[in-house]
Regions:
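Glycine- and charge-rich intrinsically disordered segments
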Residues: 1-21
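Class I S-adenosyl-L-methionine
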Residues: 19, 23-143
């Protein structure tokens, strides 16, 4: 038995959806995941799957979304977190190493990207870790 609201209907994969719809779904999932980061809760596979299913209305098993899209939602959630709490991190300490430690604490809550699609492997697509992105921004003088 399936709980999918799309049971019996053909499911259009997120990757083949119009770009605006795909982006909106990823952003919706990211907003769900933002609460995990804000509460200091680790985002595991079940939490990520729940956020994606809620945003898209179907499971990965149905082909409506893949883990590449799910990992993109996590990355967007990290950006949302930094937009919201970055100024507080910046105000907490003037030491850039202490700031980096706070950023890394958030990064450790994100899941590792172990489920890689053939496309990701073929193009050697890897994400920039949050800490490295923060260091690059710091070096560039972004505040």
């Amino acid at each position: 038995m399936t709980n999918s609201p799309l049971a019996g209907a053909s499911v259009r994969p997120l990757a083949s959806a119009c770009p605006e719809q795909a982006a909106a779904s990823i952003i919706a999932a990211a907003h769900d995941l933002l609460g995990h980061f804000a509460a200091g809760r680790r985002i595991d596979a079940p939490a990520l799957r729940t956020a994606m299913q809620s945003a898209i209305g179907a499971s990965d098993a149905s082909g409506a979304w893949d883990w590449k899209a799910a990992y993109e939602a996590v990355e967007v959630a990290q950006l949302l977190f930094m937009r919201r709490y970055g100024p507080a991190i910046h105000a907490k300490t003037i030491d850039p190493f202490e700031r980096l430690q706070l950023v890394e604490r958030i990064a450790r809550l994100a899941p590792t990207q172990t489920r890689r699609s053939e496309e990701m492997q073929a193009y050697q697509q890897f994400s920039t870790p949050l800490g490295l992105a923060w260091v690059a921004g710091f070096a560039a003088g972004f505040h």
